[in-house]
Amino acid sequence: MQLVPLELNRSTLSGISGSISISCWIIVFVPQIYENFYRKSSDGLSLLFVVLWLAGDVFNLMGAVMQHLLSTMIILAAYYTVADIILLGQCLWYDNEEKPAVDPIHLSPANPINENVLHDVFNEQQPLLNSQGQPNRIDEEMAAPSSDGNAGDDNLREVNSRNLIKDIFIVSGVVFVGFISWYVTYCVNYTQPPPVEDPSLPVPELQINWMAQIFGYLSALLYLGSRIPQILLNFKRKSCEGISFLFFLFACLGNTTFIFSVIVISLDWKYLIMNASWLVGSIGTLFMDFVIFSQFFIYKRNKKFILN
């Protein structure tokens, strides 16, 4: 493959951002599926959130097929649906598993070791144990004994720094893969002769399939509605425990790059109408995901205050 220089234009910018968006959406479900598997629990996720997202992806798939979108988009829509089913399966499986019985002796108020943690054990807002009865990895590290009274803050900052570096590395890798996959295609197409167009043939017009648009708007409404139960669950628990930060980070990045890839091509009204349902869904869910992002940081500070 011959490397070729980039020509920055609307098509190039749209292609790069679109490819990055696809990379984000391919990986988006993996962090949450792993989080559920690691904790052997999905109690941090709202079941209604997963069900509505699955319904939205089903309508998105139907709309993509009816609107005759690119085969890549149809394959991705089908992939999203399968990933949703896996996520839903985890929720149903772990919810039906037997929870470990609580030992009333070890949690007795008469036991001085548990005097300060009895309330927290029964409080969903500050879980000390995961579903297997094992201490959470971060809580374990922050609880490390030290003669320094500020050791808890130092450990917390150290854990947060490691997690931040890890997240930056993962996100950068996904963005890089998205760019490289686009650039390889760009180089291959660059070396091929352009297709010969017959000037006598009329330029094909954009055809709007209104049934596909209806499915697209239904999908957008379901995507928007899916975030509400999750936001309310986080607010009720005063915690984002059990939710993968990368899950929503990749969703935000995927939506942002998708929106840019669409509007950078053209602002023609007919073109925007054809893509309006997908744009509405992406913009709306992006706003809702920012709300969940704010909950991550708000409840993270609350947890630090409680630990101190």
Swiss-Prot record:
Glycans are attached at residues 9, 189, 275. Residues 1-12, 66-68, 189-205, 266-277 are vacuolar. It comes from Saccharomyces cerevisiae (strain ATCC 204508 / S288c). GO terms for biological process: basic amino acid transmembrane export from vacuole; L-lysine transmembrane import into vacuole. Belongs to the laat-1 family. Residues 34-44, 90-167, 227-244, 299-308 are cytoplasmic. InterPro entries: LAAT-1 (IPR051415), PQ-loop_rpt (IPR006603). It comes from the Eukaryota. It is a multi-pass membrane protein. Its main location: membrane. Amino acid transporter that moves lysine into the vacuole. May also contribute to low affinity arginine import into the vacuole. Has also been suggested to mediate export of cationic amino acids from the vacuole. May function as an amino acid/proton antiporter. Pfam families: PQ-loop. This is Vacuolar lysine transporter YPQ1. One of its GO terms (cellular component) is membrane. Present with 1800 molecules/cell in log phase SD medium. It is found in: Vacuole membrane. Gene3D superfamilies: 1.20.1280.290. The chain crosses the membrane at residues 13-33, 45-65, 69-89, 168-188, 206-226, 245-265, 278-298. GO terms for molecular function: basic amino acid transmembrane transporter activity; L-lysine transmembrane transporter activity.
